[in-house]
């Protein structure tokens, strides 16, 4: 017999030898290992997970200096040391050291924050680590898959991702999806004794298995070593690249203009030109942008996890912010998934069988441990759960699977006779019992009555097994009865749906139940009853009445879909995406995985299977719809912070490049590159706090609108550049400030002008963040305390430098407190128009400005054709009155809504009001009575008037 070391070195072929030999080679039994044996073996085989590549901390740190934005700064450093050494002056060591310091500071912050975010993410993902049922010390328990070692006995069931390579023990064949490993699209049937591979998904069946390989020794582990993961460039990275390219191009344009004007035209000295180019390079590059955005997402991701939504993919946050359609499972998300049975409504179809016996048969066909919601409800209806197995001996249990849609128990009674009971979908049980047409019609009519009251149906059948073997087909099945299942809506679902509607998120119900049940649930939740059976839209037998309307339009307008199969979910998502919607999809089962993958945001609900979690982008740890809507709001707040910063970054690039370019070219004033470095360092320190800023989430779905970011940045940055140019002109060429405020003139002192321009640029540049972070007036929306404190500290430092600094190398001299006060006043006065520009850009980009100017002709007034019709009507009225005629009824005097966009907005508002009104009705006495009457099936006339 070989040792465990031989097993580790794979000198023994455990895949092919008989199963009994496997136990001998692994020195284990069908009773599993002890905890001590497991700990000893993990020292030999290592943990059951793939080895993570250890990354050098130094290389990771230096990696933050290796991106296009950093390259520009590094080019500036090379210019400062290599090119800036002409005209008898030494190399620009101060700027070189300053640039290196800026790069190191930025990389250090990035490194620390990403490290913290990585640790937080690792802690969160540990909660999502695959779990498995393992037999240790003779007891079954759920453990992390990482503790598995060869020799462990594990339980595999529907929806599980197989945790290690294993050989199947006795039981029914298993259907396994190996597409992730082998590319086979169809599930493979695995029989007892055969091997199943780590990473494949159980599609059908339940069985025990003995682990033969773990971690890097598995088939999956070996393949992972051979294949390097491909890095897909996400949408977020593309946006980051686009903004970075815009800033770099803006700087390049400014530099080309400076080179053309300064050298051939103005005949400036070589060194002066280099210094001016350095100003544009250092001041224009938003070096902190990758750090700020990644830190903002990491902190936001942590905040989402605290609300019960763990993000597996960081960029899912931006997609969540833009989500406008949410396809939500009914069971467990909109409802409690706590089923109850009204015994009075149970229907019996077998002579000599009581209603209590129907319930007992249903409980017998249920699991007594490791239950799903239906099993728990059936066993819970018994006075004592032990009754489900009292007086019988279990021979074989057939677990639920999506194909058969039923469970079954083969058992031996006290007399030694063999029987089988089954519960499941009525259609499947009717087919199983080969029911007559009359019986089928009767059953289906009762199912419809249940459905009208919002009740699901569960059928029960029984048979005798005279052959007394578990494989035998048995005697004909007998249809025993029908049970009504009530799954009450969550108490917060109706309110959450109303909130979602107000946030611009259309919630569509996805249910496998009948259409009538879906409509009744939709009515109770106030989400509308415009629902379709998915087979009528997407199946092979499509509804002829709907054939004239495009399927995409029907799906887009629907409030929900009933009778949904997993493949329909995928098609629903696909059709909605074709209509340019950002779609979220919830799911919990193995068959939901394709739809979760296809959706822009796949959401695995609480208690989802491993397969669903693996396919999703966000995993919920709390049940219900409210956690999703809270996550939407939080995602929008996170996205708002990122968008605010990108507008700010573009604005600063424009204001620095074109402000200093104009001053350098018009007045040949050479601003100090070192002072621009000081501005950049103080700005970066302040702007890091934006990741924790207080913001108002967008009231509608939001997304990266590069046109808006660039337009806003150019206008705000351009305005600030002009204000700096005007300030410089007033201080350098006029005595306006001296005459108005009584400060001494600095018009002929370039060093003091340097201090004045530095302070003005520093204040107004950093204050711009308060404009870009707010949707309304910037002084109305209170910023976060950290941002405010950072701004005040940075500007106090900037003011002290401007007042007292006397640095010859930076060509700056203190201007005194009088000038500092004047500059602060000038900055405050020029700050206020920034909000107006922001509103104007938003209005122009919305399309309404051009529409009102050219089509509706209502710009600057709400009257069509600029009030032409009203003026004509008034003139006509005056003329008729003048001639003694009766005034004619004025037609079309009042303004019309001539825009399709406005009409659609009005329709949307009306729809919203109708939904809220319907919701409010449910909370009135009338709505409550009608709901109870319908639920109980009472045959009474509900009064038409109520007095409350």
From Swiss-Prot:
Changing residue 684 to A/V/R: No effect on ATP affinity, but loss of proton transport. Changing residue 106 to A/D/K/Q/T: Reduced proton transport. Disruption phenotype: No visible phenotype under normal growth conditions, due to the redudancy with AHA1. Aha1 and aha2 double mutants are embryo lethal. The modification Phosphoserine is found at residues 899, 931. It comes from Arabidopsis thaliana (Mouse-ear cress). Residues 2-61, 115-243, 292-643, 694-709, 773-784, 835-948 are cytoplasmic. Changing residue 924 to A: No effect on phosphorylation. It is an enzyme of class 7 (translocase). Phosphorylated, probably by PHOT1 and PHOT2, at C-terminal Thr-947 in guard cells in response to blue light to induce stomatal opening. InterPro entries: ATPase_P-typ_cation-transptr_N (IPR004014), ATPase_P-typ_cyto_dom_N (IPR023299), ATPase_P-typ_P_site (IPR018303), ATPase_P-typ_TM_dom_sf (IPR023298), ATPase_P-typ_transduc_dom_A_sf (IPR008250), HAD-like_sf (IPR036412), HAD_sf (IPR023214), P-type_ATPase_IIIA (IPR006534). The C-terminus contains a R-domain composed of 2 autoinhibitory regions (863-885 and 904-919). It is found in: Cell membrane. This is ATPase 2, plasma membrane-type. Residues 946-948 are annotated as: Interaction with 14-3-3 proteins. Regulated by an auto-inhibitory C-terminal domain that can be displaced by phosphorylation of Thr-947 and the subsequent binding of 14-3-3 proteins. Negatively regulated by PKS5. PKS5 phosphorylates Ser-931, inhibiting interaction with the activating 14-3-3 protein. Positively regulated by PSY1R. PSY1R phosphorylates Thr-881, situated in the auto-inhibitory region I of the C-terminal domain, causing pump activation. Negatively regulated by the secreted peptide RALF. After specific binding to FERONIA, RALF causes phosphorylation at Ser-899, mediating the inhibition of proton transport. Belongs to the cation transport ATPase (P-type) (TC 3.A.3) family. Type IIIA subfamily. Changing residue 655 to A/D: No effect on ATP affinity, but reduced proton transport. Residues 82-93, 265-273, 666-670, 731-751, 806-813 are extracellular. Changing residue 904 to A: No effect on phosphorylation. Changing residue 655 to K: No effect on ATP affinity and proton transport. SMART domains: Cation_ATPase_N (SM00831). The catalytic mechanism involves at least four different enzyme conformational states named E1, E1P, E2P, and E2, with the E1P-E2P transition accompanying the transfer of ion across the membrane. E1P and E2P are phosphorylated intermediates. The chain crosses the membrane at residues 62-81, 94-114, 244-264, 274-291, 644-665, 671-693, 710-730, 752-772, 785-805, 814-834. GO terms for cellular component: membrane; plasma membrane.
